[in-house]
Amino acid sequence: MEWHRVVFAVAIAYLIGSIPVGYLIGRAHGVNILQHGSGRTGGTNVLRALGFGPAALTVLGDALKAAAAIALARHILLTGELGAALAGAAAIIGHNWSVFLKFRGGAGGMSTAAGLIALNAYVGVPMVVIAALVFYLSRYASVATLTASVGGLAALTVILLAFPAVAHWEHLVYGFLTSLACVWALRPNIQRLLAGTERRVTRW
């Protein structure tokens, strides 16, 4: 593995992740999403501020960022699986702490899930289904994000141990880093969940 390729992939992935899709969509509608609700740029806050259509576009854009970063590292820069995993994690970090928004951003749920699918669909697709079910039943976007990130790390570990032929240990790096990023970004939400004051998503 050529480390200069990995470093370049990580740097580009961070910039890709930093593209503030929700913020740009909000601006297109005359709204500064940073001044609404949670102040985050993710789909949940866009949904609350602007409705379903803009939120759906935000979710799609955020998902594509992580997938594009991994595809760039894996198929164009040929970094190998570790480089792809690090690039995916860098995209999530860029999404959560965008250099273009003075290091503000989202919580990384959709980007993390999309990156998980891009790295290992055997893990990613079931985890997205589970996270979606958790969201549907609880209406807590934060819990769904934690399910996709921390649950994804747990699932990657189980798959690696049980079915090593369809897993790569390098993907655990992605799972670990993205879990840290999501948990850190969701600290206020976790506190509200523990206090029973977290807002549910009710607008569609």
Show the residue positions of the predicted features:
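Loop-to-transmembrane alpha-helix initiation sites
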Residues: V125-M127, A141-V150, V166-T178
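N-terminal signal-anchor transmembrane alpha helix
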Residues: E2-A28
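Helix-coil boundary and interhelical linker segments in multi-pass alpha-helical membrane proteins
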Residues: M1-A11, A68-L86, I117-G124, V158-V173
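Short, non-helical or kinked segments that cap or interrupt transmembrane helices
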Residues: N32-G43, F100-A113, Y140-S149
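C-terminal ends of transmembrane helices
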Residues: G22, R27, I92-R104, I130-R139, ...
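Interfacial segments of multi-pass membrane proteins
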Residues: L47-F52, A73-I76, G94, G108-S138, ...
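Cytosolic, membrane-interface loops and tails of multi-pass inner-membrane proteins
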Residues: Y23-A55, R104-G106, R187, Q191-W204
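Multi-pass membrane catalytic core of lipid/isoprenoid biosynthesis enzymes
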Residues: R48-R74, A87
